[in-house]
Amino acid sequence: MCGLFEFPTYFYPYDISFCHGVLPTVTSSASPSGNRTRARKSLGQHFLADTRIAGRILEAADLSPDDVIVEIGPGRGVLTKRMVDRVKRVVAVELDGELAEALPSRLDFPANLTCVKADARDVDLTELIAPDTSYKVVANLPYYAANPIIRRLLESEPKPDVLVVMVQQEVAKNMVAQPGDMGILSVATQFYARAKMVCSVPPKSFRPPPKVTSAVVRLDVLSTPAADVASEEGFFTVVRAGFAAPRKQLRNSLSQGLGIGPIAGGRVLEEAGIDATRRPQTLDIPEWASIYQVWAKTADDGMEGA
């Protein structure tokens, strides 16, 4: 078993010998007592400085004394210091080596804090969370990495019970969108979780302020996906195909995306009970599942590409 489960400590650089299998993504010779306040533009850093917003995030996370929290992007610890006194354990994943090393000392070395220097896009949660452990994720995500991190968490094992994430407002709107305004991100998010907008976050809430407004979203992860499909990979192949040309009617966008021709695409939609003139953004997840099921069957039967 990985040493992260066995030894009380505060900072793991993630390349230590007893927690092998993941290489460090950032190296730093900074002292753990370092107190850097300047954000690194190359890492997309914007430090949360608004205590009111911090309170909204923690309220949305609905913390309890038995909670295990994975915090992604703790930065200078504005959220971390409020969580360590309220939950069982906090595992903080920070890409910036200097900040990762400084965080435990900044918070007076709380016994229930483990800080890991790693890229959340690559981190193996099984190295951080004991098997069968329920956990929540609280994250202030850099804009450039938000989508892959959220996708990795939703597709991971073990999955979190709840995610409370700070993302760009436009991304947040896409995550919670309803039929009529849905996109690939909407379908991908809501296939795995119920999504709820918590609040908007103005640029002035950060140091330095970003150029765009952010938002906090809560995701309650479903015990089973929103649709029962034989292959999640196949399901999302169909969804991506449908959104290949989102302004076109489904008959054309789906046919183009799957490379099956408009006649065959029309037949798939007809058998699935979907009006071929609809736009992809109007479909809900069960309707996408119906299209996938017909497509998978006809593909197995050798669909003509006409």
For the regions a protein language model found, what residue spans apply to each?
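Primarily a LysM-type cell-wall glycan-binding module
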Residues: 246
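Short helix-coil junctions and helix-kink-helix linkers
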Residues: 255-257
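Catalytic cores of RNA-modifying enzymes
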Residues: 11-241, 270, 274, 281, ...
